[in-house]
């Protein structure tokens, strides 16, 4: 099943050790290099899957940033993938590096990299686009932020959304809503904006002391999926 893992080493000890985990790398694409970046990452994904055993998703957001997501069954599999990458000198890997030599300016530059714990996966095979909201939890409030996010899942999915939630070790919680296309997403937004259930849930949370702040919204189109 295709899975989109929204943008998250967090809850390493508080979540189940069997939870799926992963690594997210964000690459800022040089202006005018979008097609080259897409071609390079599309070609590289199956090579990395073969070497590391990870399920890989790759997408691009509205900021021309590549989201490269490697997902593993658990932390042991994550560690084995890292060991394999460090030890592997396959011909395919070498050929790919040779095909895409360094350029000036570079095609893309690494902007961020972090580990994830998946709290909830989405349930669709047609998650081609995602709206991802990054919530920065106040100190000591990450668990509460996750609990609040989980309250929205049945409400949003009842309206046709497909939700994934993940978290990192910096207090961030990522809430991703995925659809087959942008038109479906737009229709869902209109329905959600008019929903009394959504409004009621927001109202109940707004009566409490805020535990997190929405700091970024990513609109991602996925062009590589497992």
Spell out what each predicted region is.
Residues 18-200, 204-226:
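Short S/T/G/P-rich N-terminal loop/turn motif that feeds into the first structured element of a domain
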Residues 1-4:
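Positively charged n-region of N-terminal signal peptides that target proteins for export
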């Amino acid at each position: 099943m295709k899975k989109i893992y929204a943008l998250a080493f967090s809850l390493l000890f508080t979540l189940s050790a069997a939870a799926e985990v992963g690594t997210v790398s964000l690459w800022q694409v040089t202006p005018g290099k979008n097609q080259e970046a897409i071609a390079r990452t599309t070609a590289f994904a199956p090579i990395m899957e073969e070497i590391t055993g990870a399920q890989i998703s790759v997408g691009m957001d509205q900021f021309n940033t590549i989201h490269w997501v490697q997902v593993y069954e658990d932390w042991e599999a994550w560690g084995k993938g890292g060991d394999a990458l460090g030890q592997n000198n396959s011909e395919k890997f070498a050929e790919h590096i040779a095909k895409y030599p360094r350029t000036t300016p570079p095609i893309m530059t690494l902007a961020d990299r972090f580990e994830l714990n998946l709290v909830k996966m989405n349930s669709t095979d047609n998650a081609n686009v995602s709206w991802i909201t990054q919530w920065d939890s106040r100190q000591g409030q990450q668990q509460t932020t996750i609990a609040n996010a989980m309250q929205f899942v049945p409400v949003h999915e009842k309206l046709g959304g497909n939700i994934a939630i993940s978290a990192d070790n910096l207090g961030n919680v990522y809430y991703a809503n995925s659809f087959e296309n942008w038109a479906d997403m737009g229709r869902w937004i209109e329905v959600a904006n008019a929903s009394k259930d959504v409004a009621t849930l927001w109202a109940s949370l707004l009566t409490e002391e805020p535990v997190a702040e929405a700091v970024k919204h990513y609109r991602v189109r996925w062009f590589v999926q497992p």
